[in-house]
């Protein structure tokens, strides 16, 4: 099997990053609406970090929010970051391994869509986010399409040819709690007759 980074680098070269943007648009929109509503109620400017940002579409979207004063995206694929930087906007992009990179500043909002189950040790990454990356009174929000209750996702590792974790909704939520987050909630976004929905986990 290929490493996830190899897969995503290939996708960036053949244009599949645009397909990811299209396929993830609805659940991400729901997640971002949740974030912006909360930040508008708080009323202060906020910084935003997207983990596994791909071509940067979520980063660009968030920077348009009036209270967002900084938007940063991190991705392990140089090709993805090259695609992101091609837009020549005011967003900042970093090439880096999420499990190894160390950040100098904390962020008020941290978002990630369809990344966590590709990580070798997702529990360690969540602990690092809780202890070192998320600012006080900040918000982490994560979207996961591959989880045990979503039967359609069970074959994805073989379909794509890369390693992926498969955990239940309960196991994911408990992992967030064990990482040190005080409040953890979950729901499914973009549910319809043919799709179990994106598992969304929010924590602070």
Where are these regions (language model features)?
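Conserved S-adenosyl-L-methionine
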Residues: 181-192
């Amino acid at each position: 099997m290929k490493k996830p980074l190899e897969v995503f680098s290939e996708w960036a070269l053949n244009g599949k990053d645009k397909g990811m943007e299209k396929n993830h648009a609805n659940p991400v929109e729901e997640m971002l609406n949740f974030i912006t509503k909360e930040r508008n109620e708080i009323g202060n400017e906020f910084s935003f970090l997207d983990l596994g940002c791909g071509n940067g579409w979520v980063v660009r979207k968030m920077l348009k929010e009036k209270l967002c004063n900084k938007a940063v995206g991190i991705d392990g694929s140089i090709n993805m970051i090259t695609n992101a930087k091609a837009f020549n906007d005011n967003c900042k992009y970093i090439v880096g391994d999420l499990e190894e990179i160390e950040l100098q500043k904390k962020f008020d909002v941290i978002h990630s869509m369809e990344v966590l189950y590709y990580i070798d040790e997702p529990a360690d990454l969540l602990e690092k986010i809780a202890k070192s990356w998320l600012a006080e009174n900040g918000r982490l929000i994560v979207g996961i399409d591959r989880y045990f209750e979503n039967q359609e996702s069970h074959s994805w590792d073989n379909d794509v040819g890369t390693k992926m974790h498969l955990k239940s909704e309960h196991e994911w939520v408990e992992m967030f709690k064990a990482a040190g987050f005080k409040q953890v909630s979950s729901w499914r976004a973009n549910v319809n007759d043919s799709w179990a929905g994106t598992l969304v986990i929010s924590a602070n």
